[in-house]
């Protein structure tokens, strides 16, 4: 039996240069286990900033999943993150977090944040 998986999304910005412009389009997504999901964050003018994605699950501290390093044009996974599970990329002023092969434990709040390093 396949279970439906709810992925709740929230978008916050720790003190950053563009915090007033940081907006998330999607507030909630529900997907079946084994499927994929994409979360979009609007970040105008963020092409030279580090883009970070976090997961916050109930009763746990927020966990940084990955970040995009603009000077090397690469995605850096944090320690302990399974390669291929998450990816990020941009289209104009939008940054997307892609989640693959969803499981029940992927439920939580996903945050995008920007830093200048």
Curated annotation (Swiss-Prot):
GO cellular component terms, A-Z: external side of plasma membrane; T cell receptor complex
All residue ranges annotated as the Ig-like domain in the record: 21-117
Coiled coil, from the record: none
Signal peptide extent: 1-20
Main location: membrane
Compartment annotation: Cell membrane
Keyword match Glycoprotein: yes
InterPro entries linked: Ig-like_dom, Ig-like_dom_sf, Ig-like_fold, Ig_V-set, TRG_var/const_region
Disulfide bridge map: 41-112
Keywords on record: Adaptive immunity, Cell membrane, Disulfide bond, Glycoprotein, Immunity, Immunoglobulin domain, Membrane, Receptor, Signal, T cell receptor
Residue positions the entry lists as glycosylated: 105
Domain of life: Eukaryota
Gene Ontology biological process terms, A to Z: adaptive immune response
Matches recorded under PANTHER family: NON-FUNCTIONAL T CELL RECEPTOR GAMMA VARIABLE-RELATED, T-CELL RECEPTOR GAMMA CHAIN
Function recorded in the entry: Probable non-functional open reading frame (ORF) of V region of the variable domain of T cell receptor (TR) gamma chain. Non-functional ORF generally cannot participate in the synthesis of a productive T cell receptor (TR) chain due to altered V-(D)-J or switch recombination and/or splicing site (at mRNA level) and/or conserved amino acid change (protein level).
Known partners and oligomeric status: Gamma-delta TR is a heterodimer composed of a gamma and delta chain; disulfide-linked. The gamma-delta TR is associated with the transmembrane signaling CD3 coreceptor proteins following the stoichiometry: a single gamma-delta TR heterodimer associates with one CD3D-CD3E heterodimer, one CD3G-CD3E heterodimer and one CD247 homodimer forming a stable octameric structure. Upon activation, gamma-delta TR complex associates with FCER1G to initiate intracellular signaling.
UniProt name for this protein: Probable non-functional T cell receptor gamma variable
């Amino acid at each position: 039996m396949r279970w439906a998986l709810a992925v709740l999304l929230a978008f916050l910005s720790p003190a950053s240069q563009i915090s007033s412009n940081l907006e998330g389009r999607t507030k909630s997504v529900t997907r079946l286990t084994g499927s994929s999901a994409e979360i979009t964050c609007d970040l105008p003018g963020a092409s030279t900033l580090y883009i970070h994605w976090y997961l916050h699950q109930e009763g746990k501290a927020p966990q940084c999943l990955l970040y995009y390093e603009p000077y090397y044009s690469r995605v850096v996974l944090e320690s302990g993150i399974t390669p291929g599970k998450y990816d990020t990329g941009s289209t104009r002023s939008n940054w997307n977090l892609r989640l693959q092969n969803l499981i029940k434990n992927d439920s939580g709040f996903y945050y995008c944040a920007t830093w200048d390093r």
